[in-house]
């Protein structure tokens, strides 16, 4: 698949196309994921270790097998939405980074959307309805931000409880306050 050509640490480390295979942790985690096919999976790796590459590899596997039909990526900032969409496009996954809550329906040319945590919190019911409409993989990037505002954590639960699969990513699997991740 196209994901096999994705640099293990895209976009920040290895130059595009220079890394021919997954890093050891990515390969081990992918094997565990595909063997167990969990509804929820947490990948913890240091910044720059290749969490994006790992998540997109999982997404390509699940999409190509038909296990999921749509992908939703949730991240902390607008800028990251566009980074995710660009990385996903390189492996053949078409993500709409400019999707807005006022749009409602997603264009048929897209395999999914990229959202911010604040965007989900602003209309959790909309995102739950979208998640209910198709077998969806939800990638929660920098999931430790899910506890930044109580409403964000509540909205994540409300919007994505019906997801077929949820893949949480973090380089910081803890918080300095009492909010849960």
Name the predicted role of every residue range.
Residues 36-38, 67-68, 108-110, 132-134, ...:
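Short loop/turn elements that form and flank the Walker-type P-loop nucleotide-binding site
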Residues 175-181:
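Short regulatory helix/loop adjacent to the ATP-binding pocket of P-loop NTPases
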Residues 37-58:
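Walker A/P-loop
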Residues 43, 113-115, 138:
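Hydrophobic positions in the central parallel beta-sheet of the AAA+
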Residues 52-57, 67-90:
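Conserved Walker A/P-loop ATP-binding site and its immediately adjacent core
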Residues 88-125:
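Inter-Walker segment of RecA-like/P-loop motor cores
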Residues 117-119, 128-175:
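SF2 helicase catalytic motif II
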